[in-house]
């Protein structure tokens, strides 16, 4: 299958195009922090010439502990998203967890995300598809890459072909994830754009008993490896104070490192996509 290109305004999302950054923060902690992070991303990506989509969650409905911070909720979250969109002229991506959230969220954001833990929930898939929005499907940690075709088929049957596939690691025993680089290449064979969530792939699920641990010291190495595959995009989360972030701080990139980090990722992407394909199957 040929590479599918998804048009998001002036941004082209495809495996054979310059990579798109899907980045921001894990969960909305406050309006001011969200604006600060969005401004930093906007400035850095504009300087480096990287197409950019702002990401944050309004509700983390799948936290390990009932006492963990979840976010401001949909109503307040959408207000913050609207302000970010109008202030910085940025497209937006966020996740939904329930059927009733799909339509109102799709009125504000450009891409709605299907969480990995919910990727086989047919009613949610159908509701998302019917919004007509671009969809980002997080590959579940428990599914093989080739099984993503079943999720794609559900969206297609519900009338939506604007699909992005996102790798975020696979379960490797207890409290650990690994990334199958060949699995991302296998998903690329579908023709749909494939992006790599390089920060969530650093998770150690349940590694801190009541919350996820992580390995942000290896954020650069893992992302470089993924970008060497020639992907449609990179998905990352950053925070000005990762040690005190309200969710997934151990995986978050320190915000002050963003420009250096993205400079390297762009260099890898540019280099890999300058190569002529080699068919080693023959």
Swiss-Prot record:
Its EC number is 2.5.1.55. Keywords: Cytoplasm, Lipopolysaccharide biosynthesis, Transferase. Pathway: Carbohydrate biosynthesis; 3-deoxy-D-manno-octulosonate biosynthesis; 3-deoxy-D-manno-octulosonate from D-ribulose 5-phosphate: step 2/3; Bacterial outer membrane biogenesis; lipopolysaccharide biosynthesis. InterPro entries: Aldolase_TIM, DAHP1/KDSA, KDO8P_synthase. Signal peptide: none annotated. Gene3D superfamilies: Aldolase class I. It is an enzyme of class 2 (transferase). The keyword Transferase applies. It catalyses: D-arabinose 5-phosphate + phosphoenolpyruvate + H2O = 3-deoxy-alpha-D-manno-2-octulosonate-8-phosphate + phosphate. Its main location: cytoplasm. One of its GO terms (biological process) is keto-3-deoxy-D-manno-octulosonic acid biosynthetic process. Belongs to the KdsA family. HAMAP family: KDO8P_synth. This is 2-dehydro-3-deoxyphosphooctonate aldolase. The gene is kdsA.
